[in-house]
Amino acid sequence: MRHKIITFILAVVVIIIIGNMIGGGGGSEATSKTSSSSKAETEKTYNIGDTVKTEKTEVTVTKVEDRDTVGTQYVEKKASEGGTIVAVQYTIKNVSKKPISSFSIPTVKLVDADGTSYDSDIDASVNYATETKVDNSKILSDLNPNIKVTGVKAFEVDKEAYAKGTWKLKFSNDVIVKIK
């Protein structure tokens, strides 16, 4: 009986270790750093309002604002103490001849001057979509050829760091847009 218990405990520990190795174990807001300065030097940076064409998409960041709250009187998200919410609106158009799977639509990260990237705040993003009347669910669907959709994201970051630093949006298709 004792051998079975020890075997069971070891199996659970091995599963946890394997899960952490596969999943990366990350739950923090700052998810990664840029690994190579030479890569950063070769990446072209665009500005708010520029339409950037890639092989499959056209991406345009249309609006960026930092706020203390996002949402409406019924659904509101306030920034944490010492934080600010960076709210972003953008469009993505499929310029290819085939539908783009929802899993292949570019994701968006906020990146500071040190290369640390930040994930969006889900609650703040939903509340900002409600406030701006943007149907964010369209970003979650397959995108057919010549169709353009609007998306919104909201990121919560340190207010002081945001006020002082240079910030960019990085799309997973390597489009980088300087926002501050």
Curated annotation (Swiss-Prot):
Subcellular location: Secreted
Principal place of residence: secreted
InterPro entries in alphabetical order: DUF4352, Immunoprotect_excell_Ig-like
Low complexity bias spans: 29-39
Pfam family, one: DUF4352
Gene Ontology terms: cellular component: extracellular region
Keyword terms: Secreted, Signal
Region annotation (Disordered) ranges: 25-46
Signal peptide: 1-30
Induction comment: Transcriptionally regulated by SigD. Negatively regulated by TnrA under nitrogen-limited conditions.
Protein name according to UniProt: Uncharacterized protein YxkC
Organism: Bacillus subtilis (strain 168)
Record lineage: Bacteria, Bacillati, Bacillota, Bacilli, Bacillales
Gene that specifies this protein: yxkC
